[in-house]
UniProtKB/Swiss-Prot annotation:
GO terms for cellular component: cytoplasm. It comes from the Bacteria. This is 1-(5-phosphoribosyl)-5-[(5-phosphoribosylamino)methylideneamino] imidazole-4-carboxamide isomerase. It catalyses: 1-(5-phospho-beta-D-ribosyl)-5-[(5-phospho-beta-D-ribosylamino)methylideneamino]imidazole-4-carboxamide = 5-[(5-phospho-1-deoxy-D-ribulos-1-ylimino)methylamino]-1-(5-phospho-beta-D-ribosyl)imidazole-4-carboxamide. HAMAP family: HisA. One of its GO terms (biological process) is L-histidine biosynthetic process. The gene is hisA. InterPro entries: Aldolase_TIM, His_biosynth, HisA_bact_arch, Isoase_HisA-like, Isoase_HisA-like_bact, RibuloseP-bd_barrel. It is found in: Cytoplasm. One of its GO terms (molecular function) is 1-(5-phosphoribosyl)-5-[(5-phosphoribosylamino)methylideneamino]imidazole-4-carboxamide isomerase activity. It comes from Buchnera aphidicola subsp. Baizongia pistaciae (strain Bp). Its main location: cytoplasm.
Amino acid sequence: MIIPSIDLIEGNIVRLYQGNYDTKTFYQNNIYDIALKYYNQGAKIVHLVDLDGALCPNNKQTSLIKNLLNYFNFHIQVGGGIRSYKDVETLLLNGAKRVVIGSSAINNITEVEKWLLEFGYKSIVLALDVYVRNNGYKEVVINGWKNRSNVSLESVLERFSTLGIKYVLCTDVKKDGTCLGPNFTLYKNISKLFKNVCFQLSGGIGTISDVISAKKSGIKDIIIGRALLENKFSLLEAIRC
């Protein structure tokens, strides 16, 4: 499934380059128009990211996210700055199809395990942003990609897979926002290790050829952001290829 992504800072659509907030690009698209465009082109679910909240939970774009969830009648998964049971509950009550949990899965892992059991695996997406070192070690980065965790991707997946986690959004930070092609080796390796997990590929998709290769690699879901915003190809083309 192709999942279009919309990242927001102060109500504006943006894209970061390799997760760096200092290299953000603003787009003039109206968020309501672009989300509706994706839906009309066949999106089954839209990935919405509150980058203000990801960087600082106290700055979450709460009102905007709520308005978007109330406005649209299609499925949306929401991430960015989700740090508490109340955050998860509120988003689901406001209409989010899934809630994306990132930094909290590292900083407060026991609490997140409770959320998974409480709200169910269909409502939670585990978001693991990784920095792949030269030696191949895959370290999870947190807090808006600002901090390293000293925790490996595999160790987090191992723990949550025993609890029945279904959806995992995995981003290679060095590929994010580049449109230079995904790290297919990363996704092939983790898909083989954790066969019961539905991985969402994120980072690097820039051409239709990338989409075709991603589909052939066995990844269930493919998240695309910048390439769609810059009209490198349409969502409809990505779905049909």
